[in-house]
């Protein structure tokens, strides 16, 4: 059975900002839609196989049960809950996303 996917407020804001950033640097809204769509598909893949995402603790160097998926230049950090997967944050891979997450913790 597939888990429901829930996006945090931060993740939804991040998604908008990722789209804006891609349009700003590329000048191509279609490219931004393609990148966002690819990330949403990767997150959807984690619905059925939540452990398929990479372990975040290996990257940030601190204990966490969170995982992440990457699609193109976008990355989604998610937590596996009992009945759903919560997408906590979304980053452009060109950001210093590890520092953002370490400061959060």
Locations of regions flagged by a protein language model:
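Residue-level detector of beta-strand structural context in well-folded domains
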Residues: 3, 66-67, 76
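A short, surface-exposed loop/turn module that caps and links secondary-structure elements
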Residues: 41-70
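Enriched for short, Lys/Arg-rich terminal
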Residues: 70-105
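Generic structural signal for secondary-structure transition and capping sites
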Residues: 20, 27, 44, 48-51, ...
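Arg/Lys-rich, positively charged N-terminal/basic patches that mediate binding to nucleic acids
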Residues: 1-38
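Glycine-rich, flexible loop/turn motifs
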Residues: 1, 52-55, 65, 87, ...
């Amino acid at each position: 059975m597939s888990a429901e996917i829930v996006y945090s407020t931060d993740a939804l804001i991040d998604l908008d900002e990722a789209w804006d950033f891609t349009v700003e640097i590329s000048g191509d809204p279609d490219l931004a839609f393609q990148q966002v769509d690819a990330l949403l598909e990767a997150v959807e893949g984690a619905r059925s196989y939540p452990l398929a995402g990479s372990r975040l603790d290996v990257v940030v160097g601190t204990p966490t049960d969170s995982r992440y998926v990457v699609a193109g230049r976008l990355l989604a950090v998610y937590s596996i809950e009992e009945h759903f997967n919560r997408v906590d944050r979304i980053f452009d891979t060109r950001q210093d996303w590890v520092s953002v997450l370490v400061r959060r913790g």
